[in-house]
Amino acid sequence: MNHSDSTSYSDITLIGAGIMSATLGTLLAELVPHKSITIFEQLAEVALESSNEWNNAGTGHSALCELNYTEQNAQGEVKIERAMKICEDFQLSLQLWSYLVEQGKIDKPQEFIHRIPHISFVQGEDNVAFLRKRYQQLSGHHLFSGMQFSRDHAQLAKWMPLIMQNRSATEILAASYIENGTDVNFGSLTRKLCAYLTQQGKALKLMHRVKDIKQLANGDWQLTVLDQQQQQIIHRTKFVFIGCGGGSLPLLQKSAIDAGKKIGGFPVSGLFMVCRNPELVAKHYAKVYGKAKLGAPPMSVPHLDTRFIDGKQSLLFGPFASFTLKFLKQGSVFDLPKSIQASNFSSVMAAGIKNLPLANYLIKQALLTKEQRMVELRDFIPDANSEDWQVLVAGKRVQVLIDGEMRFGTEVVTAEDGSLAVLLGASPGASISVKAMLDVLLKCFSDELPAWQHKLQHMLPSYQISLRDDAELYATLKRRFEASLLLDQ
């Protein structure tokens, strides 16, 4: 390593060139175009980790079909509050993407988003009863208007012919169906956003690894960065956003901010089965979500998805969650051990004890053979042929451990003075990237927000407005983004 340090400066620094940094960078480039922005990415291209199209399922998470967003309580009531929030949050993402296309800042929306039906599919009387309750709760609300429910095998065969092929007429099945779901290629979208940022003069530094971060006495942050020649750069900045997926927790710990001292992480690896057989691909056009098996964690909800990648359709089934020590796909087996420190030891251990069944489940999942995975796939496609499917290793997710609890969601952690923000967690993740980054603005740029209000409402017409309470505005905005994102074609 060459220790002849060079120095650099920017007003704003983003670590990790994934969908979160690209979204925050885009918002800030619009709000404060005169501010300098630097993005550091340790890999050779943007969007190679969690945001990459092959490392996630590409569902535009809006709670149209994901059953784990509408849980049933002990009294048998189906709670829809989380579903409403996720659906509303996803509308903000659609609005920003629509604005960027309308303004000519990004192009060819068909390269990153497609209209595709979202279907919930269940088996057995208890699950059918649950799905009916869910449908009754959601379908009357304008956010979920157009949702249908059926137990009729003939109708189900129209919605999902591949799944219904060669099924017994006596099987107890049901599905809900809604047309206005989406498949999102977050890799393509991230590349478009980063291209826009570089066009605006923002600096994108690939093959640059941030190895240390500390706050200076004047409140600025000093980053120690290794470039592609392994030369050390000292980079100073007023504001830092750490949005590098599984790489965020180690940097949060190095920052030494109080809010991060007791936080731990639990990495989970993902696998999918992928099918590119044109005959099978042509028989399925939907994202079909099932119900997690008893004892299985939320991240293991099975689904069979149509995907659009590189202009081609394919089918994806999974995910198969499994145990890993790595925080990133291109990470190290020492990631988890090194993340356990004196400050978070008790929290990590408490969460570990509470989640021993999860660890056991993940280890068992890791040991499954391809043929054992095919058995699970055949719950969806009864006559699935092993030769048509290949195992695909997807990305890593790091579940957040806080106060001895494992959080299944997306968390924003900030320094008390608002000079640093960190994005942690997983699903619904990329789908609500705009809402997550608005939370960063709220926590870190609260003094500037009043001056930004008009611009934010121009970009995001439902900003600070409840779409769940305004059916007319929702319908107006839906027509607008469907037209600009070519979802009405």
Swiss-Prot record:
**Which cofactor(s) does the record list?**
FAD
Q: Origin, by domain of life?
A: Bacteria
Q: Does the keyword Flavoprotein apply?
A: yes
Q: Name one GO molecular function term.
A: 2-hydroxyglutarate dehydrogenase activity
Catalysed reaction equations from the record: (S)-malate + a quinone = a quinol + oxaloacetate
One GO BP on record is: tricarboxylic acid cycle
Instruction: Enumerate the InterPro entries for this protein.
Output: FAD/NAD-bd_sf, MQO
Enzyme superclass (EC): oxidoreductase
Its EC number is 1.1.5.4
Pathway listed for it is:
Carbohydrate metabolism; tricarboxylic acid cycle; oxaloacetate from (S)-malate (quinone route): step 1/1
Name the UniProt key words of this record, in alphabetical order.
FAD, Flavoprotein, Oxidoreductase, Tricarboxylic acid cycle
Report the sequence similarity comment from the record.
Belongs to the MQO family.
What protein name is recorded for this chain? Probable malate:quinone oxidoreductase
Query: What is this protein's gene name?
Result: mqo
